[in-house]
């Protein structure tokens, strides 16, 4: 019965010319190879590594080839506590708070557009101020105080200026401070807390700034953490961090995410945007269950308990920003643009902190940082804050700058739509089939690879600079699978013919 049902289709198939039969078989094999690889994609050896290598190469390709005509006008200044500055300050164990105050005051009074401080501020350092340190405000009595107290008093008065209306809100830049985040502390009577990617981290409150920041609408804590891959490279950001603060569940945004939110003011589903409302909503959505913070052995909730993603919209770029507890590798990828040696005066400028704190006869002009995003950080070797990235080694503050720039200039990396991906893949399968039908297997493979490199590679690179990713690795794997499968049915086995001699059998 089944044999007779397929008889009409078989007759139509037999009427097709051999070339058409060969082409249709090739198309079917290519489609099967694509579907099988798509389903088994997480388990295909080498595929994830090849895709990571491809994005690394694309980042390095565009690093020095950026078009200066951009949709955004993000400009960054890095106040670098470099090796020379560190030695001039007497090689202190902690960044001197009186020097840090001078850097903060210089940027705030310029005024900068935003100030990000990537310096450890959890511990109180009871030191007396250095007599060589000169304040930009000689009448300010804070210079005779203990440095930590002077810094706290300045930040308190800075916030009060906003509340009292002494300065317009736009003239007082927001300040984002690096929150110290580490492993959970072990309880006195309990077993040691487990460590690893699946365990919660704990925020370490500042011993002298906690109350000042908590009561201010302009001062904020944020996470400086990033992900380090198995090969030691920092490729991915962590846009937020579920944590415990004391024994209470909490969620803290990354320095890049909070900076993006302050400058882009995304639409909120509940009322008007403010940094406080943004952080409250982030905590409401992504804070861990309360029980996990009570028990020191608490770990991240199981995968089926992860909250739904929070989709925000960047009106400047016209792109979505997806906050998820389980983001894809592509959604976390950092588009690195700046190195320590980058010379892009319109986009990035590195200023040794020594030029600001150690006054000379020709102090720097505040116009140098006015209207720009200022990041204070360190690059001296003893600070142990140097990281390997796809474009080379850089200090943690430079990683933060690249994260902020990536979010605001390119947005979160997203794949092109599924319709475009599969349409393009089917067209490539047609090209594979035609190549293998017109030419030998060797020539067909070479021509197919050439077409991918000549067409798909330029298109993928062009989209990459705008934060879109058109995968060129997966089609190459499909081509390899196609070459393996095509011998199964398309290539007929060789036929050995035996010729009988005329006198045989006589």
Predicted features by range, described:
Residues 1-18, 497-506:
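N-terminal Lys/Arg-rich, disordered targeting/topogenic segments
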Residues 295-306, 310-328, 362-364, 369-372, ...:
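Solvent-exposed, non-transmembrane regions of membrane-associated proteins
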Residues 482-506:
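A juxtamembrane structural motif centered on a specific transmembrane helix
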Residues 9-301, 369-444:
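Non-transmembrane functional regions of envelope-associated proteins
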Residues 309-358:
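Long, low-complexity, polar/charged, intrinsically disordered or flexibly structured peripheral segments
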Residues 63, 358-362:
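Glycine-rich, charged/polar anion/phosphate-binding loops
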Residues 364, 407-408, 464:
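Hydrophobic residues in alpha-helical segments
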Residues 413-488:
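Transmembrane alpha-helical segments that form the functional core of multipass membrane systems
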